[in-house]
Each structure stands twice: as C-alpha cells, then as structure tokens.
Amino acid sequence: DGTTNLDVVDIDGAVDMASTLQVDGAITSSAGATISTADNTDTLQLISTDADANIGPNLRLYRNSSSPADSDTIGVIDFEGRNDNSQDIIAARINVLVDDVSDGTEDATLFINTMLAGTVSSRIKMTPTETVLNDDSKDLDFRVETNGVTDALFVDGGNNNVQIGTGADFVTNTAGTSNFRAG
C-alpha cells in the first residue's frame, strides 16, 4: 500500500514530497522554514478546534535573547510583493521594539508603516507615552467619520489645518494662529 512506519528517521539531505505530510507531534526547525504555494490558497493556517472561551489559535513571535537590551526589536511582520520592475518591495510593515526591558517596568513601542512614494513610512506609532499618526511628517490627511458626518475630525496634512465638522465648519491653524469659523 506504499505505507512505511518508522520510529526514527535521520535524513541528511533534502526530502521532496509530492503528497501530504502528516505530523502528529511538534515540528522543530533550527535553520528556518519556507512555506510556498503556486496558487491563491491559504499558505499557512493556524486552526484551533478547542471549544472553550480561551484564546486560540495563537501566533507567537518570541525573541528569546540571552542578553535583552533596551531598544531591541523583538518582532517584524513584512507584507512583501513585487513592483512593475520585478523588484521585491515591502508594502507594509508592523514591528515592535522594547523600550525598557527592566523587570516590572517593561515598555514597548508598536510601529505600523506603509509604502509611500517608494519609501516605507510611519503611519501609526504607539509608544509608552503617546500614540502618533504620521510621525514622518508626510503630506497625509487624517479623517475621523461618524455615522452621519464624513469629516467629523479632519487634519489637512498639506495645509496644517484641523477641521471639526463637515468641510470647513471649524478650522484651526496648527502653526499657532487659530482661525475659527462657525457654519
């Protein structure tokens, strides 16, 4: 039937399989792993069939350093693709660094970055003391919607204005001079 049962297999070289590999235990790789597919199906699935209310499935990015230090980057998720010149690009990146590794006072910063005009740029930065949008000072607008108002809060990145309400009902210049309009 083509089935072979082995208790221990030690392979020094490559294994090429054209079928399904069933592993009922843990998989440990010391040199990394690459999972690829030639179609648009899910490349990796983490499935939990547990019926309780606890979290799961879990994806853990674990930086197990023997000498952790302040400002260590502990994990990065890159969303990569190709441009029209067949070059690999990072379209978006999420990364975390630990600002303070002191026991009991640990702090971390989360960055969310996207590609903007050929450069990966900061969109959201969450530090231990603040949340910053557009930390790289790009000409980007920021908008908050309500159920009935498209521009309930609008920050005009190119003109350095903050608007509250629809359009320009209330405008304040962020350079120090405040312009107020009631509409």
Report each predicted region and the residues it spans.
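Amphipathic hydrophobic-ligand
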Residues: 86-93
